[in-house]
Amino acid sequence: MASKGVNKVILVGNLGQDPEVRYMPNGGAVVNLSLATSDTWTDKQTGDKKERTEWHRVVLYGKLAEIASEYLRKGSQVYIEGALRTRKWTDQSGVEKYTTEVVVSQSGTMQMLGGRNSAGSGQQQGGWGQPQQPAAPSHSGMPPQQHPANEPPMDFDDDIPFAPFGHSVARHALYVLS
């Protein structure tokens, strides 16, 4: 019995250009991304820092394609899980051409990293477009609240006064004062 292989690609990189969106005859969206990943190392002989950038062709289909076309821009950092696919076509002069792409279908993943407004801006941004600034020292005696990096600011009123036991409540801290 022949065993199945594994075809899974995971990339974290930055877009080299805005997403290119097309629509299939059935109305489904298709987006092409040009994704750069970089490796850095130190040359053992010279001690110089070296960097190599690889460019990856990424294709997204369906709802992920629509989201990518709306929110991603040149410079956006993105996490991709997909599969390698090689396709063949014939160009206008009759020459057969091949290209290998990372295809992200319904079983794949595309996750935006670095916040909504981080792409293309000259200023380093924190999650959700908030500039990173050191926290002001707290003098209240209470421990400072910890906010994970990619969460929106807590500037809205909470209508839910409690959460049932057994449910995790992200972004909330419970203090018992006696």
Swiss-Prot record:
One of its GO terms (cellular component) is nucleoid. CDD domains: SSB_OBF. One of its GO terms (molecular function) is single-stranded DNA binding. Pfam families: SSB (PF00436). Residues 6-111 form the SSB domain. Residues 55-61 bind DNA. GO terms for biological process: DNA replication. Keywords: DNA-binding. Homotetramer. This is Single-stranded DNA-binding protein 2.
